[in-house]
Amino acid sequence: MSAAPSVFLIDDDRDLRKAMQQTLELAGFTVSSFASATEALAGLSADFAGIVISDIRMPGMDGLALFRKILALDPDLPMILVTGHGDIPMAVQAIQDGAYDFIAKPFAADRLVQSARRAEEKRRLVMENRSLRRAAEAASEGLPLIGQTPVMERLRQTLKHIADTDVDVLVAGETGSGKEVVATLLHQWSRRRTGNFVALNCGALPETVIESELFGHEPGAFTGAVKKRIGRIEHASGGTLFLDEIEAMPPATQVKMLRVLEAREITPLGTNLTRPVDIRVVAAAKVDLGDPAARGDFREDLYYRLNVVTLSIPPLRERRDDIPLLFSHFLARASERFGREVPAISAAMRAYLATHSWPGNVRELSHFAERVALGVEGNLGVPAAAPASSGATLPERLERYEADILKQALTAHCGDVKETLQALGIPRKTFYDKLQRHGINRADYVERAGPGRPNAISKT
């Protein structure tokens, strides 16, 4: 629920001030009343999200002097002047100078309320635009959503339209397409940006652990639960909860998550007491949850509860015009991080960028740019076919080509097993069997991670 709009009310007439305050409070405003302009001015700042209503004739600083101070503080802060009959020419001049409105005494209560509501709506739009502008500037520095294709422009516009609402969002896209980037932008561009952004990969935790991680637990809730634990949902209260790979959430946990979305409350393990939570949920899936066949055992009612707004991130192969721009950005960033000169992009490299399928999407492109910056991608990662004159048989050539594809995938994902499996689309056992058959050591590819990159060897 949004907070009631704020009003600073200034009038030295105690009875009139009290009557106006009661009228505004009955209309849903939160009113701070002051007998002097000096006292009110001390509580104002450029970040004040409300409006100012002031009488003109007051001892000390009068309403017009206060208006000039407010104009210097924030020219977009709406001020309504309350005037006597003889002050109307002064009030009209103030309107021309930037005051929002004037109300001549005596006035009906509805006149005051209507003017205040219009002024508050104007202020709300001003503050929202400022918030989005600040967040967009901050995000563009360290969290890019780069692309000039129409589909990316539409995605950016949609993000800006929904970011500052509290609507839950479902983000759909392939592995590495940037779902967490979108979720983080939704948080940073929203009024929740000062709260926590809490992420959880539902596919990375076993069923026995995920409920404790999400909902928390009390001491003695299960074997090993020695002390109280705050869950991810409660930790995200006041901010944003990002649930990645939500399609992997166990069915029993889905039931509890549906309750959280509907009631905005949790029940930690080991207690029957509920706790309210104020969260926005952004869920991500790499399968089409709207397709019953792809959805599997994911609950239909949970899908519809999350599917208030769905953002679809296109794979990189469907927006190839963005690849040179993205690659240049990643290459410059990696070169700066590694303390290297930005290497020139050769014609062969441009051809590779344009023709490669990029199964790992933006993440694969970013990793590739880092390897180019380090000078370890001289062959561009392209699997080399066996020469026709080598005398190798067809099965031998296929074996060699398969080994090259495995090495390329491991290189693209820095040895991360989960990402490599997703890119290749093969089961884990098949993957390890092929590594053993071809004599490939996964650890060799983990070691290619650059400085500052987390060691992927733990991601098994």
From Swiss-Prot:
Keywords: Activator, ATP-binding, Cytoplasm, DNA-binding, Nucleotide-binding, Phosphoprotein, Plasmid, Transcription, Transcription regulation, Two-component regulatory system. GO terms for biological process: phosphorelay signal transduction system; regulation of DNA-templated transcription. Residues 332-345 are annotated as: Inter-domain linker. ATP binds at residues 173-180, 236-245. It comes from the Bacteria. Its main location: cytoplasm. The keyword Chaperone does not apply. Residues 6-120 form the Response regulatory domain. One of its GO terms (cellular component) is cytoplasm. The modification 4-aspartylphosphate is found at D55. It is found in: Cytoplasm. It holds the Pfam family HTH_8. Residues 417-436 bind DNA. Residues 145-374 form the Sigma-54 factor interaction domain. GO terms for molecular function: ATP binding; ATP hydrolysis activity; sequence-specific DNA binding. InterPro entries: AAA+_ATPase, CheY-like_superfamily, Homeodomain-like_sf, HTH_Fis, P-loop_NTPase, Sig_transdc_resp-reg_receiver, Sigma_54_int, Sigma_54_int_dom_ATP-bd_1. Phosphorylated by DctB. Member of the two-component regulatory system DctB/DctD involved in the transport of C4-dicarboxylates. When activated by DctB acts in conjunction with sigma-54 to activate the transcription of dctA. This is C4-dicarboxylate transport transcriptional regulatory protein DctD. It comes from Rhizobium meliloti (strain 1021) (Ensifer meliloti).
